[in-house]
Design a protein with these regions (language model features):
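A generic structural motif
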Residues: 36-40, 74, 99
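Gly/Ala-rich beta-loop-alpha elbow adjacent to hydrolase catalytic centers
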Residues: 80-85, 89
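Flexible "cap/lid" loop of the alpha/beta hydrolase fold
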Residues: 94-131
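Conserved HGGG/HGGXW glycine-rich cap/lid loop of the alpha/beta-hydrolase fold
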Residues: 4-50
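Active-site loop/oxyanion-hole signature of alpha/beta-hydrolase fold enzymes
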Residues: 41-78
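Active-site signature of alpha/beta-hydrolase-fold catalytic machinery across serine-
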Residues: 29, 91-95
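Conserved alpha/beta-hydrolase catalytic His-Asp/Glu region
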Residues: 114-117, 131-157
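Structural motif
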Residues: 12-13, 78, 102
């Protein structure tokens, strides 16, 4: 796992969990805005870290906890999580001993989807991801309803 921070370590802490397909850097615009008042912590999952191997959700949480402890964080004023990052954040929230002020989930995937529906959706998701790759981001607007060039680097390597 890789961690990037913004702000003063002595200020109230804000922890971000990124969405699938992006890194912790996707939260930098918000962290830049907050850094004068908050200590912003942007972890990047091991899945996106060169030379690291994803082990488990529990291991990701262990790494976040260890980092927070190493930075002297005893309380989180805010936890922000997007999309699949909300799943990791929920696991973090249910296991951490840290005090949490507020939580904000953006597009968390908490629906219980049956096996049959998942099997039907998988080929479509696969094609959507492949089309992003093949078109070098050209289909981004069709998939995410946006085509802002400033966000393409977070989706297209």
């Amino acid at each position: 796992m890789k961690f990037k921070t913004f702000g003063n370590r002595n200020d109230p802490a804000v922890l971000f969990f990124h969405a699938m397909g992006v890194t912790g850097e996707s939260s930098e615009p918000v962290a830049n805005y907050l850094q004068d008042r908050y200590f912003c912590i942007l972890p990047t999952s091991t899945v996106y870290c060169k030379g690291q191997k994803y082990v488990s959700k529990a291991d990701e949480i262990r790494q976040v906890e260890a980092y927070l402890k190493s930075q002297g964080v005893e309380r989180l004023e805010l936890v922000v999580a997007s999309s699949i990052g909300a799943d990791l954040a929920m696991a973090f929230l249910t296991s951490t001993k840290l005090s949490i002020g507020h939580v904000f989930f953006d597009g968390g995937q908490f629906a219980q989807i049956g096996k049959g529906t998942r099997r039907m959706m998988t080929p479509f998701l696969y094609l959507a991801i492949k089309s992003l790759y093949w078109s070098k981001g050209g289909t981004l607007k069709k998939i995410l309803w946006c085509d802002d060039d400033s966000i393409k680097p977070y989706f297209i390597a």
